[in-house]
Amino acid sequence: MTVVIVKPGYAPYEAEINGLHEMQEVVGGTIQAIYPFEDRAAVACNDEGILLGMPYNRSVPGGYGGVFGPFFVCGLGEEDFCSLTAAQIKAYKKEFRCAEILIGATGNTPITMKVQPKAVGSPGQEKSRNDHPGRE
């Protein structure tokens, strides 16, 4: 299925993931789904991200607070997850385009500072936007 993957500190990117094992690899463990959006989409994240000490990732709307560790946004079918539409991919890449640094919280509302994300290169190769060719 086609999803948008969001890693702490990095720009979101489109990817294909298939099956429970790959979903768990993306989030680093047991999956928890939350439904902060008005359209048929979900955030799938690590159920124990904060307990495992995963880094803060992004704020999510709808009173859910923030997500710790990597997550992906996927579509919702009748009974399970499914691919996002092209419009949803564009919308969620825009929604999560800025990385965030957690400064504090008021109740369940995170107080964050939005920062420029690091760019994600080809799969498995993550580069900062400040990396220059020939200086690797």
Q: What does each model-found stretch correspond to?
A:
Residues M1-A11, R135-E136:
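Short, extreme N-terminal segment that most often corresponds to the first beta-strand
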Residues I31-A33, C45:
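Short, surface-exposed polybasic-aromatic patches that bind anionic ligands, especially phosphate groups
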Residues Y35-E38:
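Catalytic phosphate/metal-binding cores of nucleic-acid and nucleotide-processing enzymes, i.e., regions
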Residues V43-I50:
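Short helix/strand-capping turn motifs
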Residues G63-A86:
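Helix-rich interaction surfaces within compact, conserved domain-sized segments
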Residues C82-P123:
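Extended coiled-coil/helical scaffolds and adjacent low-complexity linkers that mediate multimerization
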Residues A119-E136:
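Non-Sec secretion/translocation targeting segments of pathogen effectors
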